[in-house]
Amino acid sequence: MNTSNKIALLIRHADRDDIPEGSFGNDVLLNQMGQVNAFNYGEKLKNQQITKIYSSPVPRCVQTAEFIGKGYGRTIEIIETVALGAPGLHINDEKIAGKYYLEHGFDIMYESFKNGTIIPGMATLESLNQNMNDFIHKHTNENETTIFITHDMLIAFYHFSINKTVYTKENWVNYLSGITFKNGVNER
């Protein structure tokens, strides 16, 4: 009988202030509410076995991991990886995709992705799905919960690639929310 229990939480970083128009916002840190919410998120996970958090190297994601660790109350290794941001597995060429993003905006990028249109510098739906599935599977430990902290764009694109989940302004990826996988199966 297999009693394995691999849980992966792919979540957006905690609350931040608005990103200045015309920028990527990589320097925007968590605000006070984000720090408190990340700490509280960690407290709620105390009954789970967590030893690692994988994080985008963007500072607000690393901060989120640190505050989750403080709330959890035990040592958690934080591993920064560009697979989750700066640029992330949804981006093949940061300069080309960044230029497209600044010229056209996120809404056009997301619509194009959902329609299967090739976006300059971005991964295809199929390659994003395969690369993220492989990354999460490789880094999720048996009988543990592993946390992956990233950005709303990667979550929205990846979730669509899994099961055509569409995020809108009304149901956008909230801070500290995302996709849960149990034994490799998407539960949300």
Task: Pin down the residues of each PLM region.
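Short, active-site-adjacent cap segments at secondary-structure transitions
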Residues: 61-62, 154-156
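Residues immediately flanking
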Residues: 14, 152, 158
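A short, acidic, amphipathic alpha-helical segment used as a generic capping/interface helix at domain edges
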Residues: 128-142
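Acidic, low-complexity terminal tails and accessory targeting/binding regions
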Residues: 1-4, 84-98, 141-144, 156-188
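Phosphate-handling substructures
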Residues: 18, 23-24, 28-32, 68-131
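Generic beta-sheet signal
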Residues: 6-9, 142-152
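Active-site-proximal alpha-helix that buttresses catalytic centers in soluble enzyme cores
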Residues: 1-81, 118, 166-183
